[in-house]
Amino acid sequence: LDFAQEWYKEIWEEITEILLEAGKYAKQNEVRLSVHPGQYTVLASDKPNVVENSIKDLEYHSLYGSMMNLLPEDFSMNIHLQGLYGGTHDAGIKRFATHFPYLSDYAQKCLSVENEDKPNGYDITHTLELAQRIPIRCTLDTHHYDCHRMVETERVKVEGKYVNRKVREVDHITVTSDL
């Protein structure tokens, strides 16, 4: 991305070399790398400027995987669905699905969504519903699930057809400092 090259122009060559080396190491050691863009990356937003900035942020993060020469199955960008804003879950899911095609092909293939830790937020059933509409990976964050038990176990049913992206499953576990 042009803005990333501008920000880091003085060390761009060095960054490129380091990332290529990191990617080579990850492949040789079968390490799957992931990033977790921040809470302001909201593809389900109803605000055009937030969506535009979210797309830029996701493209910026996907640049790391690309510069490491990693295939999407070896690099993941994990975000929350978000974007409820007093509306319905379905409206947010529709907005996310509408904005998703504006991402580059590589960014789309690297992106995954996870359940949230907020009461009345998007739970794993909502992320699975999104995966019925668009080809996106879903992550169950056990920390968020355990904190709020927002989803009753019997409600979590994997039904329908999902895209098999030949991606190794990944556990996303958060451990707090008091454990």
What spans do the regions from the language model cover?
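Glycine-rich, proline-tolerant flexible connector loops at the mouths of alpha/beta enzymes
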Residues: 1-11
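A short acidic (Asp/Glu
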Residues: 3-4, 44-46, 123-125, 148-152
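Active-site acidic/histidine proton-transfer and metal-coordination neighborhood
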Residues: 11-137
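A short alpha/beta connector and helix-capping loop motif
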Residues: 52-55, 133, 147-179
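Non-globular scaffolding segments
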Residues: 143-145
